[in-house]
Amino acid sequence: MNVIYDFYNNGAEIGRLERGLGIVEFHRTKEILARYIDGGKVIYDIGGGIGMYAAWLAKKGNEVHLIELAENAVEYAKANMMQDCQFIAETGNALQVNRPDGSADVVLLMGPQYHLRDRGERLQSLRDAFRMLKKGGLLVAAGISKFSSMTWALSVYGEKKNASLMEFLDDPVFFNMIKGEMTTGDHVRPTEYPKFIAESYFTTAEEMKSEIAVAGFTVDKAIAVEGCIWFTPHLVEKWEDEASRERLLDIVRLTESEPEMMGMSPHFLVVARK
């Protein structure tokens, strides 16, 4: 847990959703959330980082509580994310959130589930979310595909960037990392790659749906976030063009619920009800 705390306390989330593939992730996640959340809801954003989603949801007229492990992320949210909205931001742990039973319309777990490598802790986080939700309340949990690092490495294999070849797959250290992810789900960041995401548990949509059901929820569906469009050549340039962006979004919307696509998407969301 200390490694995860340090990763986010050192500013890993600042700017991440405003550049590169993060822009697509942010756009699509908001698009999906908007299908289920309008205004007037009590929302607990557990592990919500610097408050990008908390701020957006607050602007839609919701009472948002950002509960984040990393103290510096909370302070950043207070200093930078509330110029035109207000939400509660405080430190807390997804395993035991300081909120009353049956007090939330929505609980977001868009981070904790893929940083809890122990299944018992993932279930504990889910059960605490269940406890806090009102009857019929909405859970949205995010997962990272166990194939995400592998597909990314394949997408850049042999490309030249800044005069260097992108040949991560030829590095035994990197290859052992993705082998662990694909076989066990465990992502253990090598010391040789300090900018990679901190220790995590990468999974499949089916496994996450199963764990959510074990915690007592009624699972609605899994939805691919970036889907298959993330490896589009020149994605950033195409995203900036409105017509091209809509074509890309049409593709991911049409395929977002296909089980065959779920492992190809870096992130997916599972939607469930209490």
Give the predicted meaning of each segment:
Residues Y44, M52-Q96:
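Class I SAM-dependent methyltransferase SAM/SAH-binding core
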Residues V106-G120:
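A short SAM/SAH-binding and catalytic strip from SAM-dependent methyltransferases
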Residues E207, E211, A215-K274:
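C-terminal lobe and adjacent flexible extensions of AdoMet/dcAdoMet transferase-like proteins
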Residues M1-G39, Y44, M52, W56, L138-I178:
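Conserved class I S-adenosyl-L-methionine
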Residues L123-K135:
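A short glycine-rich, Lys/Arg-flanked "PGG" loop and its adjoining helix->strand segment in the class I
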Residues L116, E192-E207:
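Acceptor-substrate binding/catalytic loop of class I
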Residues L95-V107:
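A short acidic, Gly/Pro-enriched loop at the edge of an enzyme's catalytic core
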